């Protein structure tokens, strides 16, 4: 459950390290974002000499949440951190690598490029 003012780690090599959510897009509940939802965020911490700078406004898709996600088969999945991958207007990742495990629900929401870059799909 990601809401406005929530901080997320960035799980790619676009240059940002932490982003803060300022708007939740593309969900039935506009107050909270879950895995696979698109958010708008502002970069709070960034690596130097990278394409994404501090205070840039970016679009991102949530790939991990600490709040447990209930699947249709009854299984519940939860991660150690809240994380997102920065995307462009075409829903393609801006980075070339993705770090950490990614939830399988992203495949259902047509983020197949992120799934293909992920080292582990849970």
Swiss-Prot record:
This is Large ribosomal subunit protein uL14c. Keywords: Chloroplast, Plastid, Ribonucleoprotein, Ribosomal protein, RNA-binding, rRNA-binding. CDD domains: Ribosomal_uL14. Disulfide bonds: none annotated. PROSITE patterns: RIBOSOMAL_L14. SMART domains: Ribosomal_L14 (SM01374). Binds to 23S rRNA. Gene3D superfamilies: Ribosomal protein L14. Part of the 50S ribosomal subunit. GO terms for biological process: translation. GO terms for cellular component: chloroplast; cytosolic large ribosomal subunit. It holds the Pfam family Ribosomal_L14. Belongs to the universal ribosomal protein uL14 family. Its main location: plastid. It is found in: Plastid, Chloroplast. GO terms for molecular function: large ribosomal subunit rRNA binding; structural constituent of ribosome. The keyword Iron does not apply.
